[in-house]
């Protein structure tokens, strides 16, 4: 089903070869709580990063909607972590195909370590419990600015990570590789128009990042996909 697109915006941003100068930008920090509107009013949860001296450049960048890649250092206790050990009685955890692939790869590495290093299952579980987390990559779309619809007086960086999560991740480390600009901020006549535009922004991000010049190599290759050419090593190092 096609999404509303009253302004006839394109689904693809930038050339197929990849981001153009001055992109990509980098940003990192711990996820903080925001205005509390993303999930409650919009149904679009956001993970906010502080606009501080560590990310001073963001104070002067044009306000608007950007897109790119996010990496989250989810602890082993988080249900969406590739290191997560699901309790026998727990409910199924929602995972998108990328998360499933990353978890399968980690499980294969764990099994290989057990076979090669002689690590028993009890000891392996202990090692996983002590793990502080592992960087996992997701596409993202983000707003930088004041959000005219809500008349914010404080400049913010609100990130919508394009994935399904079974729990929040406040306090988790997040890194962003911002690859392009989608559109300017604008005011809306009503909440529905704002939500429709955000959903279309997400589709723009998904389509644009699916091209090999925009896809980070560190994601690996799934069946039917081309290997990415964009250097995303900073996201996971």
UniProtKB/Swiss-Prot annotation:
Key words, A-Z: ATP-binding, Flavoprotein, FMN, Kinase, Magnesium, Metal-binding, Nucleotide-binding, Transferase, Zinc
InterPro entries: Riboflavin_kinase (IPR023468), Riboflavin_kinase_bac/euk (IPR015865), Riboflavin_kinase_dom_sf (IPR023465)
GO CC field: mitochondrion
Cofactors named for this entry: Zn(2+); Mg(2+)
Active site: 158
SUPFAM superfamilies referenced in this protein's UniProt entry, alphabetically: Riboflavin kinase-like (SSF82114)
SMART domains: Flavokinase
Location of region: Disordered: 1-23, 82-126
Compositional bias (Low complexity): 99-115
Positions with a binding annotation for Mg(2+): 46, 48
Entry's Gene Ontology BP terms: FMN biosynthetic process; riboflavin biosynthetic process; riboflavin metabolic process
Disulfide bridge map: none
The reaction(s) this protein catalyses: riboflavin + ATP = FMN + ADP + H(+)
EC number annotated for this UniProt entry: 2.7.1.26
Presence of the UniProt keyword Membrane in the record: no
Pathway(s) of this molecule: Cofactor biosynthesis; FMN biosynthesis; FMN from riboflavin (ATP route): step 1/1
Molecular function GO labels: ATP binding; metal ion binding; riboflavin kinase activity
Record note on cofactor: Zinc or magnesium.
Similarity field: Belongs to the flavokinase family.
Its biological purpose: Catalyzes the phosphorylation of riboflavin (vitamin B2) to form flavin mononucleotide (FMN) coenzyme.
Protein name (Swiss-Prot/TrEMBL): Riboflavin kinase
């Amino acid at each position: 089903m096609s999404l509303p697109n009253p302004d006839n915006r394109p689904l693809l941003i930038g050339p197929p070869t990849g981001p153009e100068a001055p992109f990509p930008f980098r940003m990192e920090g711990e996820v903080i709580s925001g205005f509390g509107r993303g999930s409650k009013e919009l149904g679009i949860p956001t993970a906010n990063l502080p606009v501080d001296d560590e990310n001073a450049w963001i104070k002067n960048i044009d306000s608007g909607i950007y897109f790119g890649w996010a990496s989250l250092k989810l602890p082993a206790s988080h249900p969406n972590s590739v290191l997560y050990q699901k309790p026998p009685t727990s409910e199924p955890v929602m995972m998108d195909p990328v998360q499933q692939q990353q978890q399968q790869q980690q499980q294969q590495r764990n099994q290989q370590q057990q076979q090669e290093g002689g690590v028993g299952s009890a000891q392996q579980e202990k090692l996983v419990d002590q793990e502080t987390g592992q960087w996992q990559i997701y596409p993202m779309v983000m707003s930088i600015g004041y959000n005219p619809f809500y008349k914010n007086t404080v400049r913010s960086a609100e990130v919508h990570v394009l994935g399904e999560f079974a729990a929040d991740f406040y306090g988790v480390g997040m890194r962003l590789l911002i690859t392009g600009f989608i559109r300017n901020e604008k005011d809306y006549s009503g909440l529905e128009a704002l939500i429709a535009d955000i959903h279309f922004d997400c589709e723009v991000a998904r389509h644009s990042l699916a091209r090999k010049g925009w896809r980070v190599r560190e994601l690996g290759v799934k069946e039917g996909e081309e290997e990415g050419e964009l250097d995303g090593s900073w996201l996971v190092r």
